[in-house]
Every structure is written in C-alpha cells, then in structure tokens.
Amino acid sequence: MMLVAAIPLAVAGCGGGDAGESATTVRVERPPFNADRAFQDLERQVAFGPRIPGSAGHAEQLEWLETELRSLAPTVFLQPFEHVTVDGNELALTNVIARFGPADGSRLLLLTHWDTRPKADQSSDEADRELPVTGANDGASGTAVLMELARMFNEQPPPGGVEFLFSDGEDYGPSTTDMFLGARHYIAGVGSENPPAYGILLDMVGDADPSFPVEAYSMEGAGQVVQRIWGIAADLGYRRFFPMDQTSRVLDDHVRFIEAGIPVANIIDFDYGPGHGFWHTPGDVVENTSAQTLFMVGDVVAEVVYRNR
C-alpha cells in the first residue's frame, strides 16, 4: 500500500455499493474470535522468514495456507499467475481463494495480502534499505485474522456466502506497476466472471497501538460498507479505535476493486510506529504487534458477517 494525500471526509451522503442499511439483517450466534490462536498464526508466518515471491518463506507460507484452508473451507482453489516487473524480473505468484456458502453475486469478499516487501525502502537508516521486511503487521496480521475467521466459519457457517482472497504480489514494488498484482489478477478472472457484492480488505491490522480511521478511497467508493463496519465497531465498544474522522488516501488492493465497480472498504492502521517508522522498515516485527488488536479487528469483521447479511 502507498500513502497518497490527506483530505477531510464527510460522514453523511456517501455512496459506493449497496451494502448499507437496506441489506437484510440476520443475526446468527457465533463463536468467539480466538486472539491467541490468531497471534500464533502471525508468529508462524514470521517464522517462515520474508514471504517475498520466489523465496523459501514464500513457498512455505503458500503450502501452509493451502493445507490449513483445505481443512476448514468447503471450497479452496489456487490462482497461479506470472508477472514480469519493470526491471525484467519474472515473478511466480499465487492467489489463494476459499469459499463458504453459495458462490453467487451476493457474497461478501474478505481479503488480505500474504506477501511481504522485498526491501525496507522506508528505513531512516540507508544501510537497512536493502534488507527484506519481516512483515509481522504488513502481511502476517491480515492473514492471521482471516485464518481465524475461517475457523469460526467452519464451526458456525455464516448466514450468506463468504469468499476469502489471500492475494499475492500486493507489496512487491517499488513502483505501483509492480504492486496490487494479486488483486488485479483476481478481478480479471473470478472478479470479472462472478464478482462479489462487496468486500472488506484487512491490511496492517496488528499494530500494538491501533487506530483505524476511515480511509478516504473507502469512503468515496464504498461508503455504505464503511458505515456498516464502523457502526458495528461502535456497537461493540471500539469507537475509540475506529474513529469516523479525517484520514488519508491509501493506494491498496481495495482501489482496484473500486475501479472495477466492486465496493471494498479498507480496514488499515497507516500510522504504524512513532512517526510511522515501522512501515516498510526493519521495525515491522512481532514485538510491535498485539493479539488484542487482532481480536478487535476479527471481532468487528465477524460481527459484520454474522449480523448483517
């Protein structure tokens, strides 16, 4: 993801999708979100090493994702693809997709990226800028939350169709030409032939000092989805952590979906560390993440799924 610019937001009068108050509300009792297990998944991913396309850690993570999801979801399939970077590097990439319930056009898409940044290009120390990013928050956190949600849905099926997309190649970079690759490939394939109704993107959702203000592109292109998510967060007592206030434009996977006419809102904490100093730096490590933050985000998304379909 990349920061674009800061702009003020108005809460009222926002468009973007039909996932708001007009949706049928069906309340289904649900199991609790297991934060300890989710955090163990975050630690497991970090233990694989950097999950850069072509690396051993990337291959191990892919195997783990597929194996774990096949034990949980009725339908799991891989979406392999290739990409040649602006520098001429050939990347072998794979999206992992899992489905619960009907795969029709009313389904909700939950997505995150599972790859990590090849270089810590935002480090203040020039000597560190060639190092790979560990990706405890930027890569592992969203994946950990979705994996635990998959376990919940296996135990108690959601009241409607839900699709998981673990996208690859989101963070390769450094230019946007070589980013958001998995989202683009999904949209050109599954998302074109059988698009979901709307979606929720999780990115950088493990910060130990969390705050999830509304991201600007999300409000503009998926305003009703935003209203639902942030409203439920307030209902659950998380209003302080999900403020409806000014935010920035963040280029991320959700923008590609919005451009394709699919309203996707981004839950993202883009103020990671003092002075945003942990993003794309060696500071993106397990010690700067929190199981409690994973719980809060997982609790909100689970409630969206089980309450509002």
Q: Language-model segments: which ranges?
A:
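C-terminal motif of bacterial Sec signal peptides marking the signal peptidase cleavage site
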Residues: A10-G13
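A non-catalytic alpha/beta surface segment that caps or lines the substrate-entry region
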Residues: G16-D18, V28-P31, R44-A103
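Second-shell loop/turn segments in exported
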Residues: V26-P32, V46-G57, H83-D87, R129-A140, ...
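Acidic/histidine-rich catalytic neighborhood of metal-dependent amide-processing enzymes
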Residues: E130-Q224, R228, I232, R249
